[in-house]
Amino acid sequence: MSPRDRFAILPSGEIRINDRSLIDLVREVELPFAQEEYNERITSGEDPSKVDLIAGNYSYLPPKMVMFPSKHLLDEPYRIAEEGFILKPEDSRRGKTTILGCTCGILECWFLLARISLTETTVTWSDFQQFHRDWWTYNLGSFIFARQDYELQLRGTF
């Protein structure tokens, strides 16, 4: 497949896809699931002041984790899901890369995964998944980036 999407990463670590914040893109697809969960918790009697609407409740990974010389967003990801949790061999979360972390600062607390696939000319992000909510469906499709431009962004030479 040929590249069709634009990838940008700011010095802060903020990821933008096609000029939109990754967190905003994710929030849009998570909102119906998070709203349903919120409503169920309130209906079951939980105090509304203590229940958060968790859609898009992420922070970007630290720049040192995603920018070169790190290859986390390429072919040497930190396997947070596999190293921090016991997963069965057939678990769909295996082989995925953590692309967003928790706002509390502990990546393993609440994180989003994606499959990152490389060819000589492209980088594809697909199969998005919230580690702790595997029933949430992410209809983000696949993002296909030109590898050369993608790597320039990771090097901070854009």
Language-model features: locations:
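Intrinsically disordered, low-complexity acidic regions enriched in Pro/Ser/Thr
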Residues: 1-158
